[in-house]
């Protein structure tokens, strides 16, 4: 145990065998002076990291005291042996004195030499990269393993913490293990850094080479008198010559200025050129002249589509207003609130998408279709900001660029199929586009200049109105396309579908003919849809079979109702209301689905068992509540309705709505359920020609419902002749086509008692129908 002055080291770690210079400040100067005063000039060098002394230091001797080339006082000290720091003791001078016990070094373990061999090899690889051949020779000459390990104190890329860890490890095997791991990690980092440097160097060399080649190419073109490719000067001339709004021109000239300052090899130059090309391709002040002939516009719409009176009238109103404003010099181009947005809602196949092209033809405008089905990124509407690689303008800007005018007809197809994704809600981005009060200053993220959309006629199509977000629907004028009557389907098939499918099959009118009777039968018995897509597929099937026959028999083919089954097989649909309602407990209801209106049967039966109500057919909560209301109404009002009040007592009631795989919901089946239960209790079947729809209350009132037109069209297609609807839905009958109004007898009733009196067959005393008591015991 020796008493030595402490030499604190804050920016170095001294290991045994090392000699390092130490700059002298008052603290280190005091330690050096104290050591020199003892005669043996020994002191204890201790690393001091983050203000704390380590547990192990090095007994060192002072070899020289003098000044550095910078003039600062310094001393050279050499490490002798590791020593553990003991407690402080008093001593002469201002230095800190402590007791120090030298640490004995254990004998090297058996694997120490293997570690030393690996350490030499790794250090040789590191030093070869730096060209330190003399250091390599010195390491190879070291035979003492402890000396070899402690020589790592000279390595510059080891941190002070790592060197302190080496100092605190007296076992040479432990030190060599630490060094091998550190050198391996350093070599891996060096390889990565070298690869990065190589890639950067190759990239710079490639850029320099391309720059020199471009300069040479420019010189060669100049000598040959060839035109140079578009540069910043050319873009400036194009911008100044283009017919651009003043704010857009200013923004474009600013970008041209950036292009002039940017290097040709810079990626930013390419982005600026792409942006300028997009701006210059936009039809900023180009507008087509609208057709002012309302008669001609109506003729175009009628020629392309049968029916759809509401849509056609709205287009003609829009055109008439614009013509009147032109005549009175009120101005129609642009301006706040001057746009128009129509939403065409209806089942598939009714012609919503094709109607957009007809509207454009009728107005004399260009037409662009923007498909929105499945779009889930807000940037698809507003565009990507130019900070992103591969940024593009949004679909609205691209549609205007494609149209080549600022007043096209833009069809936003399948707007109800928009989806919310992690990149935002595209429906929310459409709010500004479709708001006539805002879209005169629409700003695309890519262009970042105001774009006037107020003169664009937007048409949006949707199958399910409820799927459109309410704020978006509020900005559109809703026009409902409920489907076609049978006469309209025949006209569409005769004038459009039949010629198109005949031409696709490679046939002529002389080779095959189809009568209107066949078209009517296909529409009524082979298809049951609101639109005409399945009708067109049926015609295509007929023409394909005729084409096959024509290869062996060139005789003309006439398809009539007698031979239609040869081409399409047996009819797929037939009136089934009479068969289904022939027994008590079955009523025919009307419903609206995503494919239009449809007929819905409600079946009721009762059985002995625990009293209660069983509901099947995948009914939603609202429909289940309607069934409960219907049953409660009959139980409380049975005697007033002429029904046995005890017929339902102690019985299990089962209510089923067929097509069990299809989910169903809504309140409009209320009176149908009451009628089915009343038919079950009374034993009087429902009249087969009747269909009905309406919500019911506990007091027996028939409340209004929606989708009346679609439901009545479905009743007409299904062969029903009489329909019951709530009295408050009577104004909806004005929307019915004249053909359907003539074919259907519509009863508007306010009380369910009147519904039962009208819909149930009269009681027949001679029939084998069950009375209430017989039913209760059946």
UniProtKB/Swiss-Prot annotation:
Signal peptide: none annotated. It comes from the Bacteria. Keywords: ATP-binding, Cytoplasm, Hydrolase, Nucleotide-binding, Protease, Serine protease, Stress response. Its EC number is 3.4.21.53. It comes from Salinispora arenicola (strain CNS-205). Gene3D superfamilies: 1.10.8.60, 1.20.5.5270, 1.20.58.1480, 3.30.230.10, LON domain-like, P-loop containing nucleotide triphosphate hydrolases. Belongs to the peptidase S16 family. Its main location: cytoplasm. One of its GO terms (molecular function) is serine-type endopeptidase activity. Induction: By heat shock. The active site is at residues 668, 711. This is Lon protease. InterPro entries: AAA+_ATPase, ATPase_AAA_core, Lon_bac, Lon_bac/euk-typ, Lon_lid, Lon_proteolytic, Lon_Prtase, Lon_prtase_N. It is found in: Cytoplasm. It is an enzyme of class 3 (hydrolase). Homohexamer. Organized in a ring with a central cavity. ATP-dependent serine protease that mediates the selective degradation of mutant and abnormal proteins as well as certain short-lived regulatory proteins. Required for cellular homeostasis and for survival from DNA damage and developmental changes induced by stress. Degrades polypeptides processively to yield small peptide fragments that are 5 to 10 amino acids long. Binds to DNA in a double-stranded, site-specific manner. It catalyses: Hydrolysis of proteins in presence of ATP. Residues 4-187 form the Lon N-terminal domain. Pfam families: AAA, Lon_C, Lon_lid, LON_substr_bdg. ATP binds at residues 346-353. The keyword Zinc does not apply. Residues 581-762 form the Lon proteolytic domain. GO terms for biological process: cellular response to heat; protein quality control for misfolded or incompletely synthesized proteins. One of its GO terms (cellular component) is cytoplasm.
